[in-house]
Amino acid sequence: PGPCNCIETNVCICGTGCSGKCCRCGDACKCASGCGCSGCKVVCKCSGTCKCGCDCTGPTNCKCESGCSCK
């Protein structure tokens, strides 16, 4: 599986103006942090306002911002 697995449509489209930095929703989608990807749900969930890191591949290998926890 790709980073932050795309589990909905397997089709990921980055929002307008988003750069291709870090995989956010899966192999086909490379969106910058904070950018929306239509048709995707991120499997890895970080607590509060924390964001899932670039190396996230799911709940068992979840990497969040420093000081944040994952579920």
UniProtKB/Swiss-Prot annotation:
Coiled coil: none annotated. The keyword Metal-binding applies. Keywords: Cadmium, Metal-binding, Metal-thiolate cluster. One of its GO terms (molecular function) is metal ion binding. The keyword Metal-binding applies. Cd(2+) 4 binds at residues 44, 56, 62, 70. Cd(2+) 2 binds at residues 18, 23, 37, 40. Cd(2+) 5 binds at residues 46, 50, 52, 56. Induction: By cadmium. Cd(2+) 3 binds at residues 25, 29, 31, 40. The metallothioneins are involved in the cellular sequestration of toxic metal ions. Belongs to the metallothionein superfamily. Type 2 family. This is Metallothionein 20-I isoforms A and B.
